[in-house]
Amino acid sequence: MNREITFFGRFEADILADRKTITIRDSSESDFRSGEVLRVCRNEDGVFFCHIKVKSVTPVTLDGLSERHAEQENMSLDELKKVIKAIYPGLDRFYVIEFTRC
């Protein structure tokens, strides 16, 4: 049985179109392994919409986020930092989970 990861519904279309290829999470959601296949569901209602395969899990700080991270999230760097600050207020250490849709 595959473990599950959730995304806000606003990211579903980008994931399904392969425009979003990373997710940035805090330490409570950093225990995924390279090669692991995850069920992907919407955070708001738990509806399943695809599977992803984890490519890597890499630590990063808020200041360490780059234009490349923003590109992989399909947004600008300023937008990315605002989203991360809104989801994880007061935190500075995160994990970049790179994935491919399967």
UniProtKB/Swiss-Prot annotation:
PANTHER family: UCP029143 FAMILY PROTEIN (PTHR38088:SF2). Keywords: Hydrolase. InterPro entries: AC4CH, ASCH_domain, PUA-like_sf. It holds the Pfam family ASCH. It catalyses: N(4)-acetylcytidine + H2O = cytidine + acetate + H(+); N(4)-acetyl-2'-deoxycytidine + H2O = 2'-deoxycytidine + acetate + H(+); N(4)-acetylcytosine + H2O = cytosine + acetate + H(+). This is N(4)-acetylcytidine amidohydrolase. Catalyzes the hydrolysis of N(4)-acetylcytidine (ac4C). It comes from the Bacteria. Disulfide bonds: none annotated. It comes from Yersinia pestis. GO terms for cellular component: cytosol. Belongs to the N(4)-acetylcytidine amidohydrolase family. The active site is at 20 (proton acceptor), 23 (nucleophile), 73 (proton donor). One of its GO terms (molecular function) is N4-acetylcytidine amidohydrolase activity. Its EC number is 3.5.1.135. Residues 6-92 form the ASCH domain.
